[in-house]
Amino acid sequence: MIREIFNSIMGEGKYIGRRFIFVRFAGCPLNCVYCDEESKGYFNRVEKIPGSGEFETLQKMEIEDIINAIDKLKTPDLFAVSFTGGEPLLYHKQIKEIAEILKDKGYRTFLESNGMFPERIFYFDIASIDIKLKEHFEYIKDEDYEKLYKNELKTIKKLYNLNSDIYAKVVIMEETNIEDVKIIAKDLSDIGNITLCIQPVTPHGNIKSPSQRKLFEIMEACGEYLKDNVMLTIQMHKYLGML
């Protein structure tokens, strides 16, 4: 279930630059072309000292062990505890129990999800939903993509109605169609006052990031519906060599 728990800087999205404890869960039903998480072969790693990047492997990782690990990694500047992945909502029952304990202890809770499981959503203080585009997959049927996209919007709407601080993120590639992102912006504006983070893909192999001009054009197109609720973020942690 748990791949690793560590303390680092949020490297992307609306809260980029804030200090977080990340609880990373293994497994995801999607297979995005730019993702390397599922290639990692380790489990139950816990950082020894906050920000050190040095880990120990635990024999077991029950809920009590997870809470203890979070408490040990807490720093005075901590902003929130992030449930990330993979896709954390594969383990929604366990996460709900962990989140309730953390709330009682005064932590903020943060969800990072692809939004494919709207029926598993419950309240988080903050949530980031990663909206997928067709080019994020080597191949996906039109009907499967439409189902995924509708579920992402349902998830966002549910979190918005729960009064979570919800924002959306979309990874932009060289081949991304501006009109596709503009549709996302319109659909978000129909839900409510939601920030959209435009994130150029981190290039590797055959995957290329978009031009500066395309990024400006996408932001302007989204601004027609979202006004100034559009922002550009990069994977800062990768540029800084952080976890």
Swiss-Prot record:
Binding sites annotated in the UniProt record for [4Fe-4S] cluster: 28, 32, 35
Catalytic activity: 6-carboxy-5,6,7,8-tetrahydropterin + H(+) = 7-carboxy-7-deazaguanine + NH4(+)
Residues reported to bind S-adenosyl-L-methionine: 86
Cofactors, names only: [4Fe-4S] cluster; S-adenosyl-L-methionine; Mg(2+)
Pathway annotation: Purine metabolism; 7-cyano-7-deazaguanine biosynthesis
Residues annotated as domain Radical SAM core: 15-243
Keyword 4Fe-4S among record annotations: yes
Cofactor binding, per record: Binds 1 [4Fe-4S] cluster. The cluster is coordinated with 3 cysteines and an exchangeable S-adenosyl-L-methionine. Binds 1 S-adenosyl-L-methionine per subunit.
Entry superkingdom: Archaea
Residues reported to bind substrate: 9-11, 24, 84
The entry's keywords: 4Fe-4S, Iron, Iron-sulfur, Lyase, Magnesium, Metal-binding, S-adenosyl-L-methionine
UniProt key word Oxidoreductase: no
Subunit and partners: Homodimer.
Chain's role: Catalyzes the complex heterocyclic radical-mediated conversion of 6-carboxy-5,6,7,8-tetrahydropterin (CPH4) to 7-carboxy-7-deazaguanine (CDG), a step common to the biosynthetic pathways of all 7-deazapurine-containing compounds.
Family of the protein in this entry: Belongs to the radical SAM superfamily. 7-carboxy-7-deazaguanine synthase family.
Name this polypeptide is given: 7-carboxy-7-deazaguanine synthase
Organism encoding this protein: Methanocaldococcus jannaschii (strain ATCC 43067 / DSM 2661 / JAL-1 / JCM 10045 / NBRC 100440) (Methanococcus jannaschii)
